[in-house]
Amino acid sequence: MRIEEGLKLGFKDVLIRPKRSTLKSRSEVALERQFTFKHSGWNWSGVPIIAANMDTVGTFRMAEVLASFDILTAVHKHYTLEQWAEFVKRSPESVLRHVMVSTGTSSADFDKMKQILALSPSLKFICIDVANGYSEHFVSFLQRAREACPDKVICAGNVVTGEMVEELILSGADIVKVGIGPGSVCTTRVKTGVGYPQLSAVIECADAAHGLGGQIVSDGGCSVPGDVAKAFGGGADFVMLGGMLAGHDECEGRVVEENGEKFMLFYGMSSESAMKRHVGGVAQYRAAEGKTVKLPLRGSVDNTVRDIMGGLRSACTYVGASHLKELTKRTTFIRVAEQENRVFGTD
């Protein structure tokens, strides 16, 4: 046993210090990024935000809408091959290039992933997703996927420390997914005592990834647009959002009614709700590590996406970054004891 003494920070612990700027308007800020990925060699450009691969958020409808904003969607792994075939058949290349094919790490998952990717050459992204990216089995699956799909962009995770980011990149990942426990419906930290404050994880993992020519995606912990800006400011190349995109028309959560008002259920993918839906219940040897919440219906995701992108542009304007890529170079974090004036509640 040992204790690391250094303080680790989450998004709520900091604000971004404003700096002099030559920008006259938020409209001058470009949010698009361009990447050439380490292993696949593929060039991609777009807004580096990803809808999370949760079965209520990472849906085909979400992918169709977010593609119009040049935003990615990690489509969840529970769609059947037939549903994928129907989606690919009706979708133009402009949508498919913004889709990530999510997979677990079983042999059946591998075979299904290969069948889905074979539906269209426009499907370029793979998202290998497990709760604990520190297992040897996970690394072996990643290596197998890289060998089988040399021209695909592979995003793999989740991890929170630099040495594991390096191992995943050296094993074939183009992008490493960073985050254990920060999600809005994740209870891993309270069930297991395991985790890492998200901002510090992003800063440390970005440093490790960029040294090897890889990228990271900050997954979890964002509850407002300012958190997204902090993630990019901390060095994240992509930011994955679940709760901020939940409860919209494009989601597939079950709708319930209480006292005449409708709500959509949103739950973590290790929650009892998710395991009952997909594997028949919680296995006797494990505990659920997610919760279920009821969200008021929020309409189309369009307005939420515009709000997030507007917040990002404004953050860039405050620090003089004309391109999103410059935000991390222009960011100085200050530690704070409060984030906002709550005399009239929170927005």
From Swiss-Prot:
Its EC number is 1.7.1.7. It comes from the Bacteria. The keyword Disulfide bond does not apply. SMART domains: IMPDH. K(+) binds at G181, G183. PROSITE patterns: IMP_DH_GMP_RED. The keyword Metal-binding applies. Keywords: Metal-binding, NADP, Oxidoreductase, Potassium. Pfam families: IMPDH. The active site is at C186. One of its GO terms (cellular component) is cytosol. One of its GO terms (molecular function) is metal ion binding. GO terms for biological process: purine nucleotide metabolic process. Belongs to the IMPDH/GMPR family. GuaC type 1 subfamily. Homotetramer. Catalyzes the irreversible NADPH-dependent deamination of GMP to IMP. It functions in the conversion of nucleobase, nucleoside and nucleotide derivatives of G to A nucleotides, and in maintaining the intracellular balance of A and G nucleotides. This is GMP reductase. It comes from Yersinia pestis.
